[in-house]
Amino acid sequence: MIIDKLYENVEKKGCVCVGLDTDISYLPKGFLNKFTNIEDAIFAFNQRIVDSTFDVSACYKVQIAYYEAMGIKGMILYKKTLEYIRKKGGIVIADIKRGDISATAKMYAKAHFEGDFESDFITLNPYMGMDTLEPYKDYFKNKEKGVFLLLRTSNEGSKDIQYLDLKDNKKVYNKVGEKIENIGKEFLGNCGYSSIGAVVGCTAEENNIRKELKHTFFLIPGYGAQGGKAEVAKSYLSGGNGGIVNSSRGILLAYKKYDEEGKNFEECARNEVINMKKTLQII
């Protein structure tokens, strides 16, 4: 199952997930000026980030909104970025955050697990109900695919709904987590984790969430630019595995710490990933 491959990558390469939420403003001016169009510039930037971090990162997360905003050409760029990572043998998470009734979800599954926009994992929003997950299940069993369901996200507004108190002294996200854990047991890999994972932001601490969701692999956003702390991220791992810690801007813009002109932006990105790995290492 795809979750076994991701688990193995974390064992070999560490728990860092490189986010390719690439905005044109992130590209060094000297690099950008070499190209006649934006799409070619961003693709070349993405390629160099992937090449420089491939042996030190577990996977890549591509946020579709940054590409959708560029129209048709942006979606071609999105397709090329996904293909480039997968052809190298890498694992790619398409951060699409879909969530809809089964008939529509079936089309989302086909769109993002097959054809032009094929990825290994996608992110989904389960707050319409767990029946919205049904059309994806065949892909878990037969197509080596997986999902990460939004559980407790890294944004400040997550408290508006996810943190609401319920009658049994639990919060909404605790109940959603129970459902994710139970449904996921049908799709366990040899590593002991399910192909149905959960998004758990590291901008807030919760001591029991890792203990309660023993078979749920975590996608952990919020590290770095969003203010998430290493100690919190580490608490959501289990022996250094069981999750991946995503950083996007912190890696893509690492060159601004050392090399404002960005002549060696890919080397700076690599060093940032290596530093993240060291910081997140559990001894």
Swiss-Prot record:
Listed GO MF terms = orotidine-5'-phosphate decarboxylase activity
| InterPro entries linked | Aldolase_TIM, OMPdecase_type-2, OMPdeCOase_dom, RibuloseP-bd_barrel
Does the keyword field hold Lipid biosynthesis? Answer: no
Which is one Pfam family of this protein? OMPdecase
Q: Which CDD domains match?
A: OMP_decarboxylase_like
Give, as in the UniProt entry, the pathway in which the protein acts: Pyrimidine metabolism; UMP biosynthesis via de novo pathway; UMP from orotate: step 2/2
Where are the catalytic residues?
A: K97 (proton donor)
Which catalytic reaction applies to this protein?
Answer: orotidine 5'-phosphate + H(+) = UMP + CO2
Q: Which SMART domains match?
A: OMPdecase
**Which Gene Ontology terms describe the biological processes this protein takes part in?**
'de novo' pyrimidine nucleobase biosynthetic process; 'de novo' UMP biosynthetic process
Q: What is its EC number?
A: 4.1.1.23
Instruction: List residues traversing the bilayer.
Output: none
Mind listing the UniProt keywords for this protein, alphabetically? Decarboxylase, Lyase, Pyrimidine biosynthesis
The record, for PANTHER family, names:
OROTIDINE 5'-PHOSPHATE DECARBOXYLASE
Q: Which family does it belong to?
A: Belongs to the OMP decarboxylase family. Type 2 subfamily.
What this protein is called in its record is Orotidine 5'-phosphate decarboxylase
Annotated organism of origin: Clostridium botulinum (strain Hall / ATCC 3502 / NCTC 13319 / Type A)
